[in-house]
């Protein structure tokens, strides 16, 4: 188009001017048609100046130079005596850009592409560029199977040489694959091969991966899958000869034909390693061992190359070259693999830098590093630093970038790029059940106080049955070696009766201090001391509660409604944590095991021990870690020492959002069995089911939960991509389907003594539920929604199908 205008302008010039081949001297230069472009700017873009002697070539260069500015649609150069007359028609200025009909491509993406091509409001309109954009967008639609799509640019003139630019889209419908044919396959059926494709000619309703809508990019991926399928099974000569994609006349159907040559199966005869190995030949040979007669496998060859690169990367060879060349022997159907290795230069780390940590101090991140400045670059150490930063839970994403130092042949800078998340949370929990009604709690937690890495929490609960307050502080790096120090103060006024638990009141307060000791990269130990004062009152005559009081030398009375008891206990607290999760929140890979326990020490009124074991394992089932299987367990056991029982208020409970969803919090397990109350002020509202013997009340059964000294909970969860959520928020929102089970029992319950009542010592009374959960890392903290349906429950259990929590509970 531009060359055509240039030719026309040249012809006009030739017809409008007459001068000799020797040229003429320009005395003056005049412009006609300039509006937006200043005369000075136009003169600066021209190679001709007043006083110059010009000829035909100079005129042609002038026209080219003016067109090259992008400001003009037409240029004419005329001679008027000794004056050079330049007549121009300016390109119109874009006043606005709008889009219509685009559903597959968002406005923001279109604007970015237009700006990258120089098309933006305030710039001049280049019709050639617009035509290229039209074609490029149509090509994009064709690549995703929308062959009837069209994109037209509508230019509406406005006053003062301005225009409105509107891109009108008619996207049409995606062409569906009618049939996929593979020609030349003998070892495997066509159905078997196509079953590994994303594109399908038939998609069952349950297949969430397959797609009948044609996309050029997906077809390329499927062809690579086909190639890998054969190469991984020994077909070293496999080749895709050609691919034909045919479109039906109505442009709504696609036929795909893939012509292949399978060849024969080949076995590996050996691996030969050569090149510059930098003294690591023995380690490299360990990575290249093969089983005799093993089939050639392309994926294993690629993995072997990657393993060699990772090995060399640990020793500072950041950019090794590893090339495998299969030497095929068609006579005996074998492949000898020749691996050439060049380690390249050994690189050293000049600096470690952090980007994106606007809140967290550099020191908080730097102390997690295992790679040292000045040492050679170890890829495994860099990765460990990334893992440790992820496990902090302070960041949504952590990426690493190894940058060569300009002018240095053997130095790099390691850059950790982090995206911080809100580490503070306002905790608010709410639940609703047909029997429980509404329950809620609140608190504030900051895991990265002022960017120092300190965890500070101020938590509190105030409702019908509890007043709770807690202040906790943890310094994860009390010493430079990573020894942590944490402390806690708490007060709790708990009315168990109003919480649908066994009837008693406990006012307690206490403190504890804990030291944490790192053992290695993934293991740590904890040890500390604690003190707690418990003031029990209003204890109703409940069998398990009375059993504990008798073991403590007390003699409670069923005729006294205000039984009270006080204890002061000192405990030795201990723990062990194994943490190999890939990140601190929303993990997708790895395991975590946490063992906690406590035992009373001399000077305590009580004598008991208590142990809890929590495990969680995440197993990704795809390369992108979008589909993940999660298995969780929680085990708990406690008992008395020296003939005493573990206090009933230390019992384990199950049910609720953190254990078995679909059941009301803490209601799974043994229920209270009461002795007949003989006090004159006995509360008639208590709904006990009392057995009688010889006309007198014997024992009374209730639905009040009392917990037990043993607990087992397990959960199997399938984490899936969240529908309608873009990849931008994939790290903030998580959807899962779950199956929960659990039970609580009392090992000290004597079923022979209480015949006719449920055997609360039986651990096989397992409750089960299934449902769906949604988690969101919101600005307020983690939001958890779950809906579960109990499908195995027992008399007295209380269902709570929908549960909603903001933050964690304590």
UniProtKB/Swiss-Prot annotation:
Its localization reads: Cell outer membrane
Say if the entry is tagged with keyword Membrane.
yes
Signal peptide positions on this chain? 1-20
| UniProt keyword list | Cell outer membrane, Membrane, Repeat, Signal, Transmembrane, Transmembrane beta strand
Where in this chain does the record put each POTRA domain? Answer: 24-91, 92-172, 175-263, 266-344, 347-421
One GO BP annotation of this record: protein insertion into membrane
Gene3D superfamilies, per database record: membrane protein fhac, membrane protein fhac: a member of the omp85/tpsb transporter family
The protein's matches in PROSITE patterns, at most eight in alphabetical order, are given as: POTRA
Gene Ontology terms, cellular component aspect? Bam protein complex
Q: Where are the transmembrane segments?
A: none
Predominant subcellular localization, coarse grouping: membrane
- Oligomeric and partner information: Part of the Bam complex, which is composed of the outer membrane protein BamA, and four lipoproteins BamB, BamC, BamD and BamE.
Name the family the entry cites. Belongs to the BamA family.
Q: What does this protein do?
A: Part of the outer membrane protein assembly complex, which is involved in assembly and insertion of beta-barrel proteins into the outer membrane. Constitutes, with BamD, the core component of the assembly machinery.
PANTHER family, A to Z: OUTER MEMBRANE PROTEIN ASSEMBLY FACTOR BAMA, SORTING AND ASSEMBLY MACHINERY SAMM50 PROTEIN FAMILY MEMBER
**Which NCBIfam families did the record assign?**
OM_YaeT, PRK11067.1
Name used for this protein in its record: Outer membrane protein assembly factor BamA
Can you name the source organism?
Shigella dysenteriae serotype 1 (strain Sd197)
């Amino acid at each position: 188009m531009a060359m055509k205008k240039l030719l026309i302008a040249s012809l006009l010039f030739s017809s409008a001017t007459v001068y000799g081949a020797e040229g003429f001297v320009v005395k003056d230069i005049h412009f006609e048609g300039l509006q937006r472009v200043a005369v000075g700017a136009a003169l600066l873009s021209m190679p001709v100046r007043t006083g110059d002697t010009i000829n035909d070539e100079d005129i042609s260069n002038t026209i080219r130079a003016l067109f090259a500015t992008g400001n003009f649609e037409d240029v004419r150069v005329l001679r008027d005596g000794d004056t050079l007359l330049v007549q121009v028609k300016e390109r119109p200025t874009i006043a606005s850009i709008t889009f219509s009909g685009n559903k597959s491509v968002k406005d923001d993406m279109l604007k970015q592409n237009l700006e990258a091509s120089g098309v933006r409001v305030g710039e001049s309109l280049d019709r050639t560029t617009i035509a290229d954009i039209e074609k490029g967008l149509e090509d994009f639609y064709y690549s995703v199977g929308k062959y009837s799509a069209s994109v037209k640019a509508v230019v509406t003139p406005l006053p003062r040489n301005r225009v409105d630019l509107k891109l009108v889209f008619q996207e049409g419908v995606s062409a569906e694959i009618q049939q996929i044919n593979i020609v030349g396959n003998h070892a495997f059926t066509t159905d078997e091969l196509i079953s590994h494709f994303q594109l399908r000619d038939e998609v069952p309703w349950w297949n969430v991966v397959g797609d009948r809508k044609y996309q050029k990019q997906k077809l390329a991926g499927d062809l690579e899958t086909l190639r890998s399928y054969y190469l991984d099974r020994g077909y070293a000569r496999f080749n895709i000869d050609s691919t034909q994609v045919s479109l039906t006349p109505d442009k709504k159907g696609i036929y795909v034909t893939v012509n292949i040559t399978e060849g024969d199966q080949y076995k590996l005869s050996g691996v030969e390693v050569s090149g510059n190995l930098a003294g690591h030949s023995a380690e490299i040979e360990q990575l290249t061992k093969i089983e005799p007669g093993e089939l050639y496998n392309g994926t294993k060859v690629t993995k072997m190359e990657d393993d060699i690169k990772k090995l060399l990367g640990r020793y500072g060879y950041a950019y090794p070259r590893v090339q495998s060349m299969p030497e095929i022997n068609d006579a005996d159907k074998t492949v000898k693999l020749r691996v050439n290795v060049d380690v390249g230069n050994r690189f050293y780390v000049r600096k470690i830098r952090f980007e994106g940590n606007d809140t967290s101090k550099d020191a908080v991140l730097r102390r997690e590093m295992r790679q040292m400045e000045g040492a050679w670059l170890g890829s495994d150490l860099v990765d460990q630093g990334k893992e440790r930063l992820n496990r902090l839970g302070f960041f949504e994403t952590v990426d690493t970038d190894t940058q060569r130092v300009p002018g240095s042949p053997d130095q790099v800078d390691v850059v950790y790029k982090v995206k911080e998340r809100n580490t503070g949370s306002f905790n608010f929990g709410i639940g609703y059940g047909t029997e429980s009604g509404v329950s809620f709690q609140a608190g504030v937690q900051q895991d990265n106080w002022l960017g120092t890495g300190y965890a500070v929490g101020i938590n509190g609960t105030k409702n019908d049955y509890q007043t709770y307050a807690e202040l906790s502080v943890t310094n994860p790096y009390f010493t430079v070696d990573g020894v942590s120090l944490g402390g806690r103060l708490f007060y709790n006024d708990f009315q168990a009766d109003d919480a649908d638990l066994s009837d008693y009141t406990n006012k307690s307060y206490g403190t504890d201090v804990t030291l944490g000791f790192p053992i290695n990269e993934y293991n740590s130990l904890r040890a500390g001391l604690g003190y707690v004062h418990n003031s029990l009152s209003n204890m109703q005559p409940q069998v398990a509660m009375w059993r504990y009081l008798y073991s403590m030398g007390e003699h409670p009375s069923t005729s006294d409604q205000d039984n009270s008891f006080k204890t002061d206990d000192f405990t030795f607290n201990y723990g062990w944590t194994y943490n190999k999760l890939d990140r601190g929140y929303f993990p997708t890979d790895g395991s975590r095991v946490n063992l906690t326990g406590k035992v009373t020490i001399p000077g305590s009124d009580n004598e008991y021990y208590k142990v809890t074991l929590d495990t969680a394992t995440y197993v990704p089932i795809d390369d992108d870690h979008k589909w993940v299987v999660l298995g969780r367990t929680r085990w708990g056991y406690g008992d008395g020492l020296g003939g005493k029982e573990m206090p009933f208020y230390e019992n384990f409970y199950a049910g609720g959002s953190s254990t078995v969803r679909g059941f009301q919090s803490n209601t799974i397990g043994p229920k209270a069995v009461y002795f007949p109350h003989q006090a004159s002020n006995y509360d008639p509202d208590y709904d006990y089911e009392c057995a009688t013997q010889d006309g007198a009340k014997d024992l009374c059964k209730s639905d009040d939960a009392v917990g037990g000294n043993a607990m087992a909970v397990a959960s199997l969860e399938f984490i899936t991509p969240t529908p309608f959520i873009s990849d931008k928020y994939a790290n903030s929102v998580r959807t899962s389907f779950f199956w929960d089970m659990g039970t609580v029992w009392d090992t000290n319950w004597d079923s022979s003594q209480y015949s006719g009542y449920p055997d609360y010592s039986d651990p096989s009374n397992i409750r089960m539920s299934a449902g769906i959960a949604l988690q969101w890392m919101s600005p307020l903290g983690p939001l958890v929604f779950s809906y579960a349906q109990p499908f195995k429950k027992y008399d007295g259990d209380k269902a709570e199908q929908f549960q909603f929590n903001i933050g964690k509970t304590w």
